[in-house]
């Protein structure tokens, strides 16, 4: 039984049978709610009224239920040939159902390429089961993914919240404290980096609906539920999450990622992709790649996936080299303050007449050159985002 694909064998304390009987799973990282998704494969289950159902769920009475996809914590089913259903064995959030139940979100995003839920079942406030109109799994292109994610996030931009770097950095610390990597990384983030409501799309969850491609929105991972807060993340964070899945699961190369990025960039606010917003010394894309790999590391521990764990560990070792480079840049940045201090010394030396006017001007000019040169070199050597 513990061989179920959704079972967190790497951190589970209670047994699968105990967890399904009680609806609570005890893990090394804390307790979570869970349920036996297999019961909804029986047609009799659909005939029973359900307390925490919403939308059309209680109206459904399928005669045929077929599993289309098992993907870790997610199970995709086809109900007759009329609907599809997505079940989470461990419900992790209500972000997907909120797209239907929150009227301003629904009206804001209705013109995008999202596939909206039309019914569902909640467990302790999170999405256990979601119903969607009938659709068929399909493949798509980096152009479509970049444009679709960009359009979604651009619609959410007016609802953005201010830079929340303190909690974003705490999010990293929480993962580091539990996973004990040999890396520690924090970022100041540009002021233009803001939080938005989370809409997560995945390249394996793209559907064809009567000839139109749609992205089925997914909830957060189990490790994020257990180890991270609920704060909003920047649009760049979800872009990097999707980038990670394109590389990890679709084998995208750097040219395809560049195409994906350009189509996303064209559709989001320009300030999100400004030089400072993408600057590695301020966090930029690389800090969110670091976050994404920490989550991958956590998921590999959670599911006991050794190959994925080794891949994450290899990437984290490369972070040390990047951090060493950033350390050198911080030394160059200190030259700005050396230059400013030199100019201050020149001014007071002139005031106190300990240096002649010409010598003071020369010293001040040298300080200015040191400051400007250090700043220019600092930004010139900033590692590129791509």
Describe the residue ranges of each PLM region.
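Alpha-helical transmembrane segments
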Residues: 346-348, 368-381
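Hydrophobic alpha-helical transmembrane segments
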Residues: 349-368
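Cytosolic-side membrane-insertion boundary helix
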Residues: 314-341
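Active-site activation/catalytic loop segments of kinase-like enzymes and analogous catalytic loops
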Residues: 228-272, 290-308
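Conserved ATP-binding subdomain of kinase catalytic cores across diverse folds
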Residues: 3-4, 9-186, 227-254, 258, ...
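All-alpha amphipathic helical-bundle segments outside canonical DNA-binding/catalytic cores
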Residues: 273-291
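Conserved protein kinase catalytic/activation segment
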Residues: 194-219
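Juxtamembrane C-terminal module of membrane proteins
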Residues: 312, 377-386
């Amino acid at each position: 039984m513990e061989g179920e694909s959704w079972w967190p064998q790497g951190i589970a304390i209670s047994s699968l049978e105990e967890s399904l009987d009680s609806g609570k799973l005890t893990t090394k990282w804390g307790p979570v709610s869970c349920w036996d998704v297999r019961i909804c494969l029986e047609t009799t289950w659909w005939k029973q009224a359900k307390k925490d159902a919403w939308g059309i769920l209680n109206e459904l009475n399928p005669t045929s239920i077929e599993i289309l996809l098992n993907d870790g914590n997610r199970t995709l089913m086809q109900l007759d040939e009329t609907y599809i259903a997505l079940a989470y064995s461990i419900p992790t959030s209500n972000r997907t159902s909120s797209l239907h139940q929150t009227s301003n979100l629904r009206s804001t995003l209705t013109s995008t390429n999202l596939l909206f839920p039309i019914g569902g079942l909640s467990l302790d406030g999170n999405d256990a089961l979601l119903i969607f109109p009938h659709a068929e799994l399909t493949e798509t292109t980096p152009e479509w993914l970049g444009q679709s994610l960009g359009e979604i996030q651009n619609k959410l931009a007016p609802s953005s919240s201010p830079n929340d770097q303190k909690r974003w950095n705490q999010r990293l610390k929480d993962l580091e404290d539990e996973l004990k990597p040999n890396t520690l990384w924090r970022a100041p983030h540009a002021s233009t980096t803001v939080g938005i409501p989370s809409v997560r799309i995945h390249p394996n969850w793209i559907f064809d609906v009567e000839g139109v491609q749609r992205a089925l929105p997914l909830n957060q991972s189990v490790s994020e539920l257990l180890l991270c807060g609920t704060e909003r993340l920047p649009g760049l964070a979800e872009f990097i999450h999707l980038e990670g899945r394109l590389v990890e699961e679709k084998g995208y190369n750097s040219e395809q990622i560049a195409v994906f990025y350009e189509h996303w960039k064209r559709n989001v606010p320009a300030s999100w992709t400004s030089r400072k917003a993408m600057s590695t010394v301020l966090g930029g894309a690389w800090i969110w790649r670091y976050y994404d790999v920490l989550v991958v590391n956590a998921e590999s521990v959670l599911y006991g996936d050794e190959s994925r764990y080794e891949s994450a560990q290899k990437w984290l070792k490369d972070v040390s080299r990047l951090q060493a480079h950033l350390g050198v840049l911080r030394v160059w940045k200190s030259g700005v303050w050396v230059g400013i201090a030199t100019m201050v010394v020149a001014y007071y030396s002139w005031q106190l007449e300990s240096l002649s006017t010409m010598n003071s001007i020369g010293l001040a000019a040298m300080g200015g050159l040191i400051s400007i040169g250090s700043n220019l070199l600092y930004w010139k050597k900033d590692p590129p985002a791509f």
